[in-house]
Every structure is written in structure tokens, then in C-alpha cells.
Curated annotation (Swiss-Prot):
Organism: Thermobifida fusca (strain YX)
InterPro entries for the chain: Aldolase_TIM, His_biosynth, HisA/PriA_Actinobacteria, Isoase_HisA-like, Isoase_HisA-like_bact, RibuloseP-bd_barrel
Enzyme class: isomerase
GO molecular function terms listed in the Swiss-Prot or TrEMBL record: 1-(5-phosphoribosyl)-5-[(5-phosphoribosylamino)methylideneamino]imidazole-4-carboxamide isomerase activity; phosphoribosylanthranilate isomerase activity
Keywords associated with the record: Amino-acid biosynthesis, Cytoplasm, Histidine biosynthesis, Isomerase
Active site: 12 (proton acceptor), 131 (proton donor)
EC number: 5.3.1.16
Protein name as catalogued: 1-(5-phosphoribosyl)-5-[(5-phosphoribosylamino)methylideneamino] imidazole-4-carboxamide isomerase
Length: 245
């Protein structure tokens, strides 16, 4: 049996609430109540991972650090923690929650030396988020440009980055389907695992992503489709298992 595509339901937190944004734009999308309840719902439905995001920290307007730490502590499954991790203090706080790994985005673009140091020190506990519009990276809560995707990828490869989380910003929260060409392109330039994020709208989208596992796609982060009931997590897990058989 081939490797199964890992599914990471997203719990994005702003102002203490679970939310989902459209194209990363503040104030868009739905609100879904208590983030711990959301995370426990996905755990109980069979998730092995949660992608937990502090949107306030990502946008640079405070944080939900204590809340996120308490959520990590109450879950029995692996957590990937993301949002506003851009210096030693925020990184150490994130790692101290006991999360399985952290996702660093903006910092990788604004401070490559720090990023290389963190990759060297923490290895597999650090994934780098590549948030992409076309072939340009989007920085700090996606409100600014952050340079060329492939130049940055080359630099991160040289630094020994263990894993990439690739988001097509234009697809995120839109239910318009993932950017398979972008994922293939990134996979062709690295032998490290790639986690896909953005645009998943249907079980067919998951089948298409699962078909890219041999090329290097390891996982898929799902948000809006799950919260809006496009399919259940149980259906999603069954679908990716079928593809792997």
C-alpha cells in the first residue's frame, strides 16, 4: 500500500474564536465558535493532526498564545502550530506548548539568517510556510510581497529545511480547488515533503492531491470545506485511504 495523504483539519483562531478567512483577508469568511471544541471535533472524527493557527499573531495584532497552548495540552493528536512565529521568543513559546511541529512563514522571508539557524537547531520540528501568489511569496498575514518563490526555495533547500507548507493565497478559503500545478512545481524542486493548503472543496480535490503523494505531497490542510460541510472528515479520511490502496 502506498503512503496515505495526511489530512490536517485547520483551526484558525482570531479574538479567541475559530474562524476561516477567504484569501487570507481579515474580516472575511465564517466564525465557528470555541476553537477547542472545533479541534476536539476533528480529533473525535479520526484526525491524526490539527493545523492550529494564531491569526492575530500572524497579522501582528496581539496573540492567543495561552489559549493555543491550552488547546495543544488537551489534544491527544499531533499539532502543527502556526502564526506569528518570527523570533526566538515566539518560537520557544510555540515549541514549549508540546506541539509536534511549528510552521514559520513571514520570518523565513524577512530574516533568512535566523531561519537557517532555526532549521539547523530544530530540524524536523520546523516546517516553512510558502504562501504564494503566482510565483511571488506573500508576507506578514499575506498583506505584503515577500520575494520570488523559487529563489527562496533554493535558499531554504541550502539551509536544509525539512518540510514545506505550500499555500496558494488566491485559492485559500475559496473552495475553488487546489493549485496542483504549483504543488507539482515545488515538488519537482525539492525532495522534502510538501503539505498542500488552500482551495480544497471536494473529495475529488483530495483524490487529486492524494495522487501527488508519489511526487512528494505528504499532507493537505483543510479548513472551509470541512466547516461548511462540503464533506465530513470521516469521508475525507476514507477517500485518501482508497487512493493509497
Amino acid at each position: 500500500m502506498a503512503p496515505i495523504l495526511e489530512l490536517l483539519p485547520a483551526v484558525d483562531v482570531a479574538g479567541g474564536q475559530a474562524v476561516q478567512l477567504v484569501q487570507g483577508k481579515d474580516g472575511t469568511g465564517g466564525r465557528y465558535g470555541d476553537p477547542l471544541n472545533a479541534a476536539l471535533t476533528w480529533q473525535n472524527a479520526g484526525a491524526e493532526w490539527i493545523h492550529l493557527v494564531d491569526l492575530d499573531a500572524a497579522f501582528g495584532r496581539g496573540h492567543n498564545r495561552e489559549l493555543l497552548a491550552s488547546i495543544v495540552g488537551k489534544l491527544d493528536i499531533k499539532v502543527e502550530l502556526s502564526g506569528g512565529i518570527r523570533d526566538d521568543e515566539s518560537l520557544n513559546a510555540a515549541l514549549a506548548t508540546g506541539c509536534h511541529r511549528v510552521n514559520i512563514g513571514t520570518a523565513a522571508l524577512e530574516n533568512p539568517d535566523w531561519c537557517a539557524k532555526v532549521i539547523a537547531e530544530h530540524g524536523d520540528r520546523v516546517a516553512i510556510g510558502l504562501d504564494v501568489r503566482g510565483t511571488t511569496l506573500a508576507a506578514r498575514g499575506w498583506t505584503r510581497d515577500g520575494g520570488d518563490l523559487y529563489e527562496t526555495l533554493e535558499r531554504l533547500e541550502a539551509a536544509g529545511c525539512a518540510r514545506y507548507i505550500v499555500t496558494d493565497v488566491n485559492k485559500d478559503g475559496t473552495l475553488k480547488g487546489p493549485n496542483l500545478d504549483l504543488l507539482r512545481d515545488v515538488c519537482s524542486r525539492t525532495d522534502k515533503p510538501v503539505v498542500a493548503s488552500g482551495g480544497i472543496s471536494s473529495l475529488d480535490d483530495l483524490r487529486a492531491l492524494a495522487a501527488l503523494v508519489p511526487e512528494g505531497v505528504e499532507g493537505a490542510i483543510m479548513g472551509t470545506a470541512l466547516y461548511e460541510g462540503a464533506f465530513t472528515l470521516e469521508e475525507a479520511l476514507a477517500t485518501v485511504r482508497e487512493v493509497a490502496q
